[in-house]
A protein has these predicted regions:
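Short cysteine/histidine-rich zinc-coordinating motifs and their immediately flanking basic loops
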Residues: 590-592
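An amphipathic, basic-hydrophobic helix/alpha-beta surface used to engage anionic
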Residues: 14
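Short aromatic-glycine motifs in intrinsically disordered, low-complexity regions
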Residues: 2-4, 20-26, 56-67, 341, ...
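Outer-membrane beta-barrel proteins
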Residues: 18-24, 306, 412-418
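Small-residue helix/turn framework positions
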Residues: 1-10, 29-53, 73-75, 80-82, ...
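Intrinsically disordered, low-complexity segments enriched in small/polar residues
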Residues: 59-61, 113-115, 279-310
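Short, glycine/alanine-rich hydrophobic alpha-helices that insert into or span membranes
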Residues: 555-564
Length: 597
């Protein structure tokens, strides 16, 4: 490959004016330099050696020269720059040509930037084009710049305009650079778009999540010489991510030891499906669109796409996000969303992640430690006050119900994907539902084929009132085991017993009905649910079962789980909640049958 450039730089002609008076105080002041057909060939090797580094001869004196060089403005005509940076895997060719006629700055900048300090910006005099690769990604672009570069005079902003594509990312900027000799400040209108925000990482080093296709339009201000590190502020931007709108302001500080991104974002109307890529829960077609190489196996439900934890230690973050209105189907009655995301040295915290659901709240604290391999996860969730009539708005029998769903869940696990985390997790799940109803029609609304089969076998075509449904599951190494799972209906007490295996996504559940009172319950044989999450299968057991674990619900041996579930009954509603009576009965010790004492 290329190891050195034949010439570092060349000029056809150079013209300059020298101010004679400052020579009296040992200052070489050049008010203006004009360069004719400048060309630079820049080369940096993989070992860091660069042809723009010069070994100057050692001075006989350690004292600095008393003379000072003061260049005020520099102008140029048609020129070119080539860059071959083997360390950054970047090869670029830049061509600069004079425009036929200067273009006024305000004509391209618009009203927002053509006011204030930027109003003094020069006209655009040159057009430029760039082509090549940047950090291994194809890059192409074009734009316009001014003719006289005001090197020191901040009152003469230098105009910039560019449209650049790099990989799947597109950027358009128009604005000014001030005090360029000291890389002083940028004032730009910036439009960004691409197939996923995560694709900005190799270009900018900013760690952003996987998203659907996005576009933003906002005001970028940069102060490049801040003491704490260069500061970039993308303020009052508006955009779209998938079918959701996005607004806000973000600040990025290139501080040490890690840069930090902070800000507040809002979405007036958030499509819930647009959150799918955050955990790899979008379709394979959508993964391909955003440039993700992993694919979800057809026989797996839990997302296998891995979090990019190797990026999490490259940047810190403190960002608040509010989704004011959630767009979803009737099966997902989520109304709003709020989260406070903090990323610090690879530890990602969502504290809280809060959803409004069916008139209640789903609140969770999530800690994902990406600084460890595999990633260590801890999740705590609580569901409070989910109104059943809002959970199932299309199910008429539930519309007169005052019932609620309440629950708690916690888990800890390790792994770099949702599937890996759940496949080896420890934790528990507790849930109570009171004053509900169920029928074949409800399972059809929810799209549950297996549920449809079970309800039909248990209750026929009738709508059945559920006094209480109570569930307590333990989770150990990815295997969730029923400690208590019971439906108390007007006709029967239905016990569900068995396991759900998150490691292999297999179901092994038995459903056993017990008739109540003098009513004769028609089903004699228990049911089963087998198969996988993707293809569950239900059927009727050939004969009676030997009770396992919590299978002795009807005999009242679930003292511990019943007592812990009582905590989910709201104190103000305990008298009306039919779960209270059921769980109180289950707390009593089992009675030993007569004759077996």
């Amino acid at each position: 490959g290329k190891t050195k450039a034949s010439e570092f730089a060349s000029l056809e002609r150079i013209e300059f004016r020298l101010a004679p008076l400052p020579l009296l105080w040992q200052t070489i002041r050049i008010p203006q330099i004009k360069l004719t057909q400048p060309r630079a060939d820049l080369l940096r090797l993989a070992d860091g050696r660069a042809n723009w580094d010069f070994d100057l001869p050692a001075s006989d004196s350690d004292e600095p020269s008393a003379w000072q060089l003061d260049i005020r403005e520099i102008g140029f005509d048609k020129g070119s720059v080539s860059l071959d940076d083997q360390r950054l895997k970047t090869r670029l060719e830049v061509l600069v040509d004079p425009l036929g006629k200067p273009v006024p700055f305000g004509q391209l900048a618009g009203k927002a930037l053509a006011t204030g300090d930027a109003a003094d910006a020069q006209d655009y005099v040159f057009g430029w084009k760039v082509k090549g690769t940047y950090k291994g990604q194809a890059l192409a672009g074009s734009g316009k710049v001014g003719g006289m570069l005001a090197l020191q005079d901040a009152s003469k902003p230098f105009p910039l305009q560019a449209e650049v594509s790099a990989g799947s990312t597109r950027a358009a900027v128009v604005g000014t650079l001030t005090d360029p000799l000291n890389l002083g400040a940028l004032d730009l209108r910036l439009k960004l778009s691409g197939t996923s925000m995560a694709n900005l990482y190799p270009l900018t080093g900013i760690t952003l999540p996987d998203t659907p296709a996005y576009s933003t339009d906002g005001h970028l201000l940069a102060r490049l010489k801040e003491e704490g590190g260069a500061l970039f502020r993308y303020e009052n931007f508006n955009g779209k991510v998938g079918a959701s709108d996005l607004h806000g302001s973000l600040t990025f500080v290139a501080r040490q030891p890690r840069p930090k991104l902070s800000g507040k974002l809002t979405s007036e109307q958030l499509r819930f499906a647009d959150l799918g890529p955050l955990i790899g829960a979008d379709s394979n077609a959508e993964k391909q669109k955003r440039g993700q190489t992993s694919r979800q196996p057809g026989d797996k439900v839990l997302p296998v796409e891995e979090f990019r934890t190797e990026r999490w230690r490259d940047m810190d973050a403190d960002v608040e996000f509010t989704g004011k209105r959630i767009v979803h189907s009737d099966q997902l009655p989520i109304s709003d969303l709020y989260t406070h995301l903090v990323l610090n040295d690879g530890l990602l915290r969502l504290e809280p992640l809060r959803f409004g659901v069916a008139g209640g709240k789903l609140e969770s604290d999530i800690r994902l430690d990406g600084g460890k391999q595999p990633m260590q996860s801890r999740v705590k969730m609580s569901a409070r006050g989910f109104k059943l009539k809002q959970l199932f708005p299309g199910f008429a029998p539930m519309q007169t119900s005052f019932g609620e769903l309440n629950g708690d869940a916690s888990l800890s696990g390790s792994g770099n994907s949702v599937a890996k985390i759940l496949g080896g997790a420890d934790g528990e799940l507790k849930m109570l539902i009171n004053d509900g109803a169920i029928s074949k029609g409800l399972t059809e609304i929810a799209g549950l084929n297996v549920g449809n089969y079970l309800v039909t076998k248990l209750f026929g075509d009738d709508e059945v009132k559920i006094n209480c449904a109570a569930a307590d599951f333990g989770l150990q190494k990815g295997l969730m085991t029923s400690r208590l799972f019971v439906f108390d209906t007007e006709n029967a007490l239905v016990n569900v017993d068995g396991t759900v295996n998150f490691a292999n996504e297999k179901l092994d559940l038995d459903v056993t009905p017990h008739s109540k009172g003098l009513r004769i319950f028609s089903l004699r044989s228990p049911l089963y649910v087998r198969g996988t999450f993707a293809k569950p299968d239900a059927g009727v057991h050939a004969g009676p079962l030997v009770a396992r674990g919590a299978g002795m619900i009807a005999l009242g041996v679930t003292v511990g789980p019943a007592a812990s579930l009582l905590a989910l009954v709201a104190p103000s509603k305990s008298d009306d909640n039919q779960c209270t009576a059921l769980l109180q009965r289950m707390r009593l010790p089992a009675k030993v049958p007569a004759g077996k004492r």
